[in-house]
Amino acid sequence: MQKPLTLFCLPCAGASATMYIRWRRLLPSWITVEPIELPGRGGRMDEFPAESYAALTQSLCDELVPSLPERYVLFGHSMGALLAYGVAQGLYARRSSMPIALLVSGCAAPSRQDSQRYNNMQSDAALIADLSRQGGTPEEVFDNQELLRMTLDLLRVDYRVCGSFEYAQLPPLAIPIHSFGGRADEISAARLNDWRLESTQTFTLDWFDGGHFFLRQSEDWFMYVLKKRLMDSRIEVFSATLTSA
């Protein structure tokens, strides 16, 4: 019988962790999908959203540490990937139980982040243009002024979080990093490849048809590859255990 594995999932900018709920029926039962909701959205709508990358990642570590499972993986898409990296580094600094892998989707490596890009997109017009370009927002959001206002306000705050990120050359993580990219996304292969610099272990980069939201546009294939990477991570942990025994 497969030993259980918890998959913690962090959302992209302007979104709720509910974007991952459907994964619970798309992935096998040995994978427990645990979406991590951020303040100011979804079930935490009544909380003030964080506006600092450092404060948000520290808060996420505070929430996770008391109940970390035996085997878990951190996954994030876009902003969520950058947060997942910060959480992994924060857990390492606290000498907490580490994830068996870090999975980063649709996000340039920490050393290749363009913080100024986010700082330049604070007006409604700039945010709407960015949403339209990325293609992940339903048309009904653009057609409903109330929904659009909520989305823009949240996206603006999330972009401030991304804009506050400052890269520091911390020790590479001693866990595998698996990166995922869209062939039609604006993020170049070089910026995705540099995730390899953040790990002393296995690094992979998988490509999918689609733009920034390739994980929806190529969902079936993405789910297949995601499951494979999770299985690979379990095997690496098992092999390491045998070697050290």
For each of these PLM feature ranges, what is it?
Residues 1-245:
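Non-catalytic, mobile gating and regulatory segments of ester bond hydrolases
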